[in-house]
Amino acid sequence: MSIGILGTKLGMTQIFDEAGNAIPVTIIQAGPCPITQIKTTATDGYNAIQVGYRETKEKNLTKAQLGHLQKTNNSALRVLQEFSIESSDSIEVEKPITVELFNDNDIVNIQGYSIGRGFSGYQKRHNFARGPMSHGSKNHRLPGSIGAGSTPGRVYPGTRMAGRKGDSKITIRGLKIVKVDSERSLLIVKGSVPGKPGGLLTITQVKKV
């Protein structure tokens, strides 16, 4: 994973380009994310930085978590996440990760949790075709066969069935940053991102090959 920043989805709107075309964009409150730990190959076996996000009350954290954050003089932070790096020589604990990590027109990957839809049936969750809705049919929204009786005599693992829909980790790749607002720590990204307003997002740089 490339170095990135944590943020909060604020919502969607639209902006207009020079030709007057409407562009759908998502507004993201990104960072600042203080560095809470620097991991090196000498001490941990790999190079990475750990960053924090979303300040909270100390009573919401354990003593172990508070002690970990106090090592770098950070306040109580609800979210901690690691980003792998090639070298930690240029990383300073005193300098938090901000939106200045990105520039206009950069391409990024954004990860978040999709909106949870609760317990859903076959048609809504997996787009199954429904049965006839009239003429004496008793198979309106049933799943149909889920396996033979004697052989194999069981339901195969992974069979698509009714269950909880959504609330899964989703990564949208190749999104374009339209504008970086350093003063208000905002990223304006073209297109949609996972989750509902207020959801946690991870924005990472795309590795250049």
From Swiss-Prot:
GO terms for molecular function: rRNA binding; structural constituent of ribosome. GO terms for cellular component: cyanelle; cytosolic large ribosomal subunit. Pfam families: Ribosomal_L3 (PF00297). InterPro entries: Ribosomal_uL3, Ribosomal_uL3_bac/org-type, Ribosomal_uL3_CS, Transl_B-barrel_sf. Residues 132-154 are annotated as: Disordered. SUPFAM superfamilies: Translation proteins (SSF50447). GO terms for biological process: translation. Keywords: Cyanelle, Plastid, Ribonucleoprotein, Ribosomal protein, RNA-binding, rRNA-binding. It is found in: Plastid, Cyanelle. Its main location: plastid. One of the primary rRNA binding proteins, it binds directly near the 3'-end of the 23S rRNA, where it nucleates assembly of the 50S subunit. Part of the 50S ribosomal subunit. NCBIfam families: L3_bact. Belongs to the universal ribosomal protein uL3 family. This is Large ribosomal subunit protein uL3c. It comes from Cyanophora paradoxa.
